[in-house]
């Protein structure tokens, strides 16, 4: 049995080494393409970049930040930017929205690494906001631009249909309650995020504010992709969407993007520029 286990381990190690060898061989074979981009730079400027797509706190922000900065610059007619995603995307609906605005191809990763092998390639690299400013809009770019990541007409209609199915009135207003807990990051394999625990809150402590808003006529949606505990309060205008079977990647974004305002614990989709009450 021990010998069989060693053989399996050896196979796994050899497979990983072979996979890595093939990848870097493809990177080296991509170097001529990179050299071509250097030669044609005076005529056509090609850049390579990436976005960390595995965390909602960085993925939409970094894309929106790139698009907002780009929008404020003079149009670069002959500049073409290409990206790839790092990590497993945290939201598939967001991936579709990003692809409508940005050229994203998995093969760009090869060209990105090939570019790094050739000297003087820094001007051909676009770093994500996560590495530049920790995904913070320090230069107030969002204040000077309209949001770039927009919903398609079909996506907008899907969100409205969801509200209509709940009996939500056409002239209604709703608030999103986005309370962070530890279960979301607990699903990330091989990573210890316990240092984020100080940001977590008990959803029960927000029941009074949810009830007060509901009594004032607001609808309150508790949002989140995965949550540790359900919302125990019951009210016709309080919806524990995060714990419901209606939850979807599209609605996760749509509700936050279209709320009247949001109540959150140091988390949220800043890219949609809604009013936000932060509680620490």
Short names for language-model regions:
Residues 2, 15, 23-156:
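Secretory-pathway glycan-assembly enzymes, especially type II membrane glycosyltransferases
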Residues 79-80, 219, 279:
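Residues at the starts of beta-strands that form the adenosine-phosphate
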Residues 172, 177-186, 203-248:
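Catalytic donor nucleotide-activated moiety binding site of glycosyltransferases and closely related
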């Amino acid at each position: 049995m021990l010998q069989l286990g060693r053989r399996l381990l050896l196979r796994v190690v050899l497979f990983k080494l072979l996979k890595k060898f093939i990848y870097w061989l493809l990177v080296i074979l991509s170097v001529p393409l990179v050299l071509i981009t250097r030669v044609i730079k005076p005529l056509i400027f090609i850049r390579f970049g990436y976005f960390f797509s595995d965390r909602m706190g960085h993925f939409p922000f970094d894309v929106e930040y790139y698009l907002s900065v780009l929008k404020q610059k003079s149009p670069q007619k002959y500049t073409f930017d290409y990206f790839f995603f790092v990590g497993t995307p945290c939201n598939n609906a967001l991936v579709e929205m990003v692809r409508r605005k940005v050229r994203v191809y998995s093969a760009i990763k090869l060209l990105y690494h090939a570019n790094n092998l050739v000297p003087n390639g820094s001007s051909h690299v676009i770093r994500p906001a996560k590495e530049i400013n920790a995904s913070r809009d320090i230069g107030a770019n969002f204040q000077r631009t309209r949001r770039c990541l927009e919903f398609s007409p079909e996506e907008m209609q899907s969100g409205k249909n969801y509200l209509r199915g709940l009996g939500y009135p056409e002239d209604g207003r709703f608030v999103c309650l986005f309370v962070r807990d530890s279960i979301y990051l607990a699903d990330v394999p091989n990573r210890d995020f316990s240092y984020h625990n100080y940001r977590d809150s008990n959803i029960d402590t927000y029941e009074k504010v949810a009830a007060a808003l509901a009594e004032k006529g607001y609808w309150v949606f508790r949002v989140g992709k995965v949550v540790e505990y359900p919302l125990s309060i019951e009210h016709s205008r309080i919806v524990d969407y995060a714990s419901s079977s209606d939850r979807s990647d599209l609605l996760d974004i749509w509700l936050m993007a279209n709320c009247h305002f949001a109540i959150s614990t140091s988390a949220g989709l800043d890219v949609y520029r809604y009013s936000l009450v932060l509680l620490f």
